[in-house]
Amino acid sequence: MMKLHKLPSVSHRLASAVRRVGLIICLFALAGCADKEVRLSGDREDVLSDLRTLMIDGQASVELAGLGNAVVNSAFGHPGVTSAHDGGHLSLDLPLKQLWKARIEETESDVVMLAQPAIVNGKVFALGSDALVSVFDLETGKVLATEQIDDAQAGLFPGVAGGLAANEKVLIAHAGRKMLTAIDSNSNQILWSVEHSEPLAGGPTLIGNEGVVVTDIDGSTLAFRLNDGALVWQTTGLPADTIVLGSGSPTVHNGTVIVAGIGGEVSANAVADGKLILGRQSGKTGTAHTT
């Protein structure tokens, strides 16, 4: 026999639904009051209170950190402007505006950094990783000349960019390989090239109008005559335990050539004959080899 069940009234169902909703609200309210994180015992410090806003020291700003007056520079013969790499405080007409751009052919910037360009006689001299020197007009960016200064297919040492140095008469360049080349900065023609036994690394740095100094991958320092490329003197290199892929770009100041090895060793040699003034070279304190 089938039994009939009496259905709850509408009011009863409504009251039941209200109770369920109320229960859910209570559960959420209790959850909101609960502690959400585990607190460890011990003292606490307010780290945000130690934050400081960068402020400019007014007195130091007025002093300009000893830079002196800004000077207008029309030539850029070395990294750092001068052979001592102490170009000083250069004047700029801000904001800077792009006048032109050009591409150096066959660069391999993923393999080697590029050398810093040099600017003399209204020209920009730039060096690509393919050992090609490109000459651009400073005002228009037009290519005026190109010169191959070494074997484009020769191997490169990662991080060795080669280098450029120039004055009103000559540009000296090497591409991180074995050749050192002089180019007439007026006619853009090669004057001379000399080949070293090891790849060159730092420099070139001009010694006035008389010479040029570079370093090689073994940390030796070499000085050449500027007019014909003849080797004047060569050091025996910084200590082997301080050298990693050569030395930095030499600095020439007050008759002294100063070189810093990548390993941290610093040496100073007399410009005239390479005589050691400061530091140590191959563990010796004698004079450099001269020719």
Stretches with model-predicted labels:
Residues 29-32:
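C-terminal motif of bacterial Sec signal peptides marking the signal peptidase cleavage site
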Residues 42-56, 63-99:
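Blade/loop signatures of beta-propeller domains
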Residues 73-74, 121-122, 168-169, 209-210, ...:
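Short coil/turn segments that connect the beta-strands within blades of beta-propeller domains
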Residues 128-129, 159, 175-176, 216-217, ...:
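Structural signature of WD-repeat beta-propellers
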Residues 99-118, 146-165, 191-209, 231-253, ...:
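Extracytoplasmic beta-rich repeat domains
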Residues 34-36:
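Bacterial signal peptide processing site
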Residues 137-141, 184-188, 225-229, 271-273:
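Short loop/turn segments that connect beta-strands within beta-propeller blades
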